[in-house]
Amino acid sequence: VIYATRFGSIDRDFRLDDKEVHLPAGVAHFLEHKMFEDQDGDAFAKFAKTGANANAFTAFDRTCYLFAATEQLDESLDVLQEMVGKPYFTQQTIDKEQGIIGQEIKMYDDSADWRLITGLCECLYHSHPIRSDIAGTCESIATITPEMLYDCCKAFYAPNNMVLAAAGNTTMEQILAACERNGLMEPRPAERVQRLWRDEPMTMAAKEKTIRMPVA
């Protein structure tokens, strides 16, 4: 089962109703991490109790939450939909996560393949958010607040902007029943969201870039 929202690392500037929101690099990925934590604890522990193997990832244009299970599918569906549908953030939990994600950022800084991709994007684009690493930087994620995360949830974590897909030993009726149980079938007004894009010249930002890394 995979539950995905059309919200990724490049969605950093948008208008939510009458409010303009400008995000630092790395918010979508940071939010992905925080979705697994609520007032009751860790969603990974809940998935473990149902026997499911859960994971998630953030890309430039989407965030996806997924699990694989051979039994207790209903229980795992409830865990997935509840954790995504009922976010919980505090400054204390955000401060804790900043250190964890900071280590992940440093790990990717040591990846030649990933540095090549980000370096290429920096050469191609002048100001488009795709220039920034999906995880952001240690400095950018240090500015993340609960309000930012709640704004992102309100704008992009709504049924009209999400897709739920399932494959395997299940039925459409079982999946729809889970959506019904967790309130996804209830009519709700769609938020007025407008993505704001920066003007991007038709020329490359740089013709070349040199990255030097230590050899292990």
Q: Residue spans of the language-model regions?
A:
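His/Glu-rich zincin catalytic helix
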Residues: 1-43, 150-216
